[in-house]
Regions:
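Serine/threonine-rich low-complexity intrinsically disordered regions
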Residues: 2-8, 33, 51, 119, ...
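A short linear-motif detector with a strong N-terminal bias
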Residues: 11, 134-138, 177-181
């Protein structure tokens, strides 16, 4: 082997050794997993189910979470003595609407705080429907106040047929404190939640969120069940990011 060839082999071998050493010296860049997105869900009156499912309100919507993780929250979902959580009536043993809402509020807030504690970087969407929307509205107000330790920047809200909808909801139309038959008006909810994007969804003439005319009485029976159906409002909107205010739908 000529001297020139020996030098070429030595240079190639040396270069290869340097490249191997450099590769070994460069640390592997870790790619962090994307933040998880939890949907904390409180269902409507009469929709209670055994844990861990807790509610039947989101059976179709949860098929459209785009990788999100549903967190169903149990509560009575009742309006006793008129209706129990399993849509049976009358039931004199069922918790009243007011009692049910209070328990829904406590359980939903506890679920949000526990989820944040276990996964501090995760996004949380607070979701409520009908009676569940009232409790979810109040939970979002609590988080917006800064009293929970959950950063507002991680939170959003989806309220379907919210009775506290400003201006048009049944509780916006009845004075705060009005009470009868186990129902007490908390008054309207806020239009904005101090930086938390919260969107309300209402089908016109649904008397829960659109108590603006006599037609809302019959409209409640016709429109109120539609949100949770396959291909309807919830399935089309639950995974949408951001947005504020009220989204109206025609009957």
């Amino acid at each position: 082997m000529t001297l020139a060839r020996r030098w070429r082999k030595a240079i190639v071998a040396g270069a290869a050794a340097v490249m191997v050493a450099m590769t070994a010296a460069v640390p592997t860049i870790a790619h962090a997993d994307p933040a998880r997105h939890y949907y904390l869900e409180l269902g409507g009156t009469g929709s209670a189910a055994p844990a861990p499912g807790c509610t039947g309100s989101y059976a179709f919507a949860n098929q459209h979470l785009d990788g999100g993780i549903p967190v169903p929250v149990c509560y009575p979902a009742s309006a006793g003595p008129w209706l129990n959580g399993h849509n049976q009536f009358p039931d004199p043993t069922a918790p009243s609407f007011d009692t049910s809402v209070r328990e829904g509020y406590r359980n939903l807030l506890a679920a949000a705080e526990d989820t944040h504690r276990r996964d501090p970087g995760a996004r949380l969407t607070i979701v409520g429907y009908s009676q569940g929307a009232q409790a979810a509205d109040q939970v979002l107000q609590k988080i917006a106040s800064g009293e929970t330790g959950i950063p507002r920047s991680l939170v959003s809200g989806k309220l379907y047929s919210d009775p506290m909808q400003p201006g048009t909801g049944i509780w916006a139309k009845l004075p705060k404190g009005w009470s009868a038959f186990g129902f007490t008006s908390p008054g309207p909810g806020p239009e904005k939640f101090d930086g938390i994007p919260v969107r309300r969804f209402c089908i016109r003439t649904d008397g829960v969120c659109d108590a603006t005319a006599l037609s809302s009485i019959g409209g409640f029976l016709q429109q109120h069940p539609k949100y949770q159906r396959d291909g309807n409002v919830m399935t089309k909107t639950i995974a949408q990011d951001g947005g504020e205010g009220v989204v109206w739908y025609e009957p």
